[in-house]
């Protein structure tokens, strides 16, 4: 039976808080002012291979997170890096990630070619795929509208990426470490499968008994290149445990449900934005045409019905050009009125010199922040981190914003 098109939910009202629960497993569709077609569209898969040139310089995309659609020798010291999107139209987030080496030590100029799209991400390098360093700004230039960068190559492999690689392997390692450190409070499992059969993980943070607790929902990595948003989510979750006394009190009344990597297919394939269905997942929160949004909305709905939770807040972690909070025009009619202003104001108090930028918008598009309000009357916020925001500040801000959220919700 296709629950997506059937609306036979029974609304159950709790006596103590007037909270509505949907007595069904699958999330119903929603109507928004702007209709967006999210039925699957064809995509182009890159060919996974090792590229060899006549000059002894080679490159490969044979690893998760890679994007290298072609590698062309212009001459013995200049090479073209081609990255094309999975399909179009698409947001201009040209992702690249590859390994490169040379048979002799040499300086090589790499020309980044994205077709009609402009360069966005400042290159990072690594010798092991785990520890990253941004290149010196003196190494990078622009010639005839194309970005070029100079690298010293040897027989040893150099990884060159748009942003630090954070794939499913890194995610599992972090979840295992978090669970080991907080085994009574952290649980994780598999909510379902992606279009290609990869695991969609969930994390359940709180005491084992989740019934009748207020619920916070966290999302990340709907868009594969948005690694800084993933870092902010990690820091936010780490911040939930920074103060043991606050955490103990908070988790007696709240649980936190996390979907830390919503688009693992896109992450593994080095996509610019979309899933394997060729769709921006953050436009599929109306009819759930894509398996990732369908699995996660069904999981949330089943969890909240089973445990009789009141969803109070949804935060979706993303990356963009600079830090910003995308909010709804007002949260006065939400289940936690005026939370947004309290939270934003409190964030400033612990981050010297930081002025949060807030961009409110109406409930027009089928995006996650709107879905939280439409379905649960919960506050929905898109928590955006800049591409180049310093990583230590991402960590500091993530932990601080978690602490202030906990304090406000405990009032």
Region locations from a protein language model:
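Extreme N-terminal flexible tails
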Residues: 16-154
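Extended acidic/polar, glycine-enriched regions
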Residues: 137-183, 189
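A mature extracytoplasmic/lumenal domain signature
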Residues: 102, 114, 162-164, 206-207, ...
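Active-site/substrate-binding loop(s) of hydrolase catalytic cores
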Residues: 187-205, 210-357, 373, 380-387
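His/Asp/Glu-rich mid-to-C-terminal helical/loop segments that flank catalytic regions of hydrolases
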Residues: 389-411
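Sec-dependent N-terminal signal peptides
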Residues: 5-13
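Short glycine-rich, acidic/polar surface loops and turns
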Residues: 360-379
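Short, hydrophobic/aromatic beta-strand segments
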Residues: 108-112, 159, 230
């Amino acid at each position: 039976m296709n629950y997506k098109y059937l609306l036979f939910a029974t609304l159950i009202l709790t006596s103590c808080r007037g909270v509505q629960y949907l007595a069904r497993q699958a999330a119903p569709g929603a109507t928004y002012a702007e209709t967006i077609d999210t039925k699957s569209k064809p995509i182009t898969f890159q060919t996974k291979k090792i590229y060899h040139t006549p000059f002894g310089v080679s490159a490969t995309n044979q690893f998760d997170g890679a994007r290298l659609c072609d590698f062309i020798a212009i001459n013995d010291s200049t090479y073209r890096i081609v990255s094309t999107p999975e399909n179009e139209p698409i947001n201009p987030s040209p992702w690249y990630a590859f390994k490169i080496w040379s048979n002799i030590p040499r300086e090589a100029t790499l020309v980044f070619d994205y077709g009609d799209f402009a360069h966005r991400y400042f290159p990072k390098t690594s010798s092991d795929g785990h520890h990253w360093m941004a290149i010196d700004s003196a190494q990078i230039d622009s010639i005839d509208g194309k970005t070029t960068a100079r690298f010293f190559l040897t027989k040893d492999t150099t990884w060159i990426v748009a942003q630090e690689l954070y794939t499913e392997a890194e995610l599992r390692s972090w979840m295992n470490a978090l669970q080991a450190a907080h085994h009574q409070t952290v649980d994780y499992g598999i909510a379902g499968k992606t279009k290609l059969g990869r695991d969609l993980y969930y994390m359940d943070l709180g005491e084992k008994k989740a019934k009748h607790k207020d619920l916070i929902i966290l999302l990340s990595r709907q868009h594969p290149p948005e690694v800084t948003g993933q870092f902010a989510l990690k820091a936010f979750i780490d911040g939930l445990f920074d103060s043991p006394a606050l955490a103990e009190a908070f988790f007696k009344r709240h649980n936190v449900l996390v979907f830390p990597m919503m688009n693992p297919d896109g992450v593994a394939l080095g996509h610019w934005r979309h899933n394997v269905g060729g769709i921006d997942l953050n436009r599929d929160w109306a009819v759930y045409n894509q398996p990732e949004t369908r699995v996660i909305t069904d999981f949330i709905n089943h969890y909240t019905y089973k445990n009789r939770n009141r969803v109070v807040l949804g935060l979706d972690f993303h990356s963009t050009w600079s830090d910003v909070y995308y909010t709804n025009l007002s949260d006065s009619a939400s289940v936690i009125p005026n939370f947004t202003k309290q939270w934003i104001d409190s964030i400033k108090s612990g981050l010297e010199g930081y002025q949060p930028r807030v961009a409110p918008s109406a409930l027009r598009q089928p995006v996650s922040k709107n879905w939280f309000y439409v379905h649960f009357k919960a506050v929905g916020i898109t928590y955006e981190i800049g591409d180049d925001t310093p990583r230590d500040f991402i960590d500091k801000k993530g932990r601080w914003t978690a602490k202030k959220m906990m304090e406000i919700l405990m009032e």
